[in-house]
Structures are given as C-alpha cells and as structure tokens.
C-alpha cells in the first residue's frame, strides 16, 4: 500500500510541475529557436515548405491545405534532426500550428480552413538545426 501511494505521489508531483510551467495563451513565449530568429524565404529542396491548395475557393467554404516540408525531397524525422512545427498563416494572421514529434511524425500536415477574402497563404516550418523556412501561395476567394 505504501509503495502504491508513493507512485501516486510521484505522478501528482510530475503533473503539478508541468501545470506550474504552463503560461496563459496571451503570455506565451516566442516559439522560434532563440539562436535562429530570421525566416528563410529562398528555396531549399530539403527545408522549404510545399503548399498544396486550390488557387481559388468560395468565400466561407471549407477546403484543405496540405503542407509538407521538403519541396524537392522529404525532410528527415530523426531524433537529432526533425521539424519542430508547421504553421499556416493567411497573410500575417496565424491560422493554425501543429507541433511534430521526432521519429514518429512525418513533416506533412493537412489543415481544413475557410477564408472570407483572398490573400497569401504562408507556411512556416522550423527544423531543429536552422531558422524557420517560409513559402507562400496566393489564393483567390470568390463570392
């Protein structure tokens, strides 16, 4: 019985430590790796995100946007080198962000979104060994 209570106490302590580190949504720390603050916008076959989405959509209707990292070849997903996250923006507004796990997650994400007006869809992907990479695609929204 004492051993069982001890294990339960350890589990509660671990949960409390995680909860204590959580920050309110408005106070989240910047997500870029501190030593890499500048976005890469030039093409790189292994690191540039590839956006697959329609060129034109109807206002307010849901559609899919698939972002994969490695426009020429897929980025690796290794313990020592992987893509931390893929984020999707409409112009400067972040729509969604998916965090990836090394080894178990391929750097490919499909988002389902709806837009009220056209603009640029921007995909940002941050690997562990460099600054984030960005690609954009114009999208037209019809009435």
Model-based region annotation:
Residues 24-57:
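Short, compositionally biased P/S/T/A/G/V-rich stretches that sit at domain boundaries
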Residues 57-70:
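Contiguous beta-strand segments within globular domains
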Residues 62, 116-120:
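Extracellular Ig-like/FN3 beta-sandwich strand-entry sites
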Residues 68-78:
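Short amphipathic, basic-aromatic surface patches that mediate peripheral association
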Residues 78-84:
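Short coil-to-beta strand junction motifs in C2/discoidin
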Residues 107-114:
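Exposed aromatic-hydrophobic patches
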Residues 127-136:
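Short acidic/polar inter-strand loop motif in beta-rich domains
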Residues 138-143:
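Short beta-strand edge segments in extracellular beta-sheet folds
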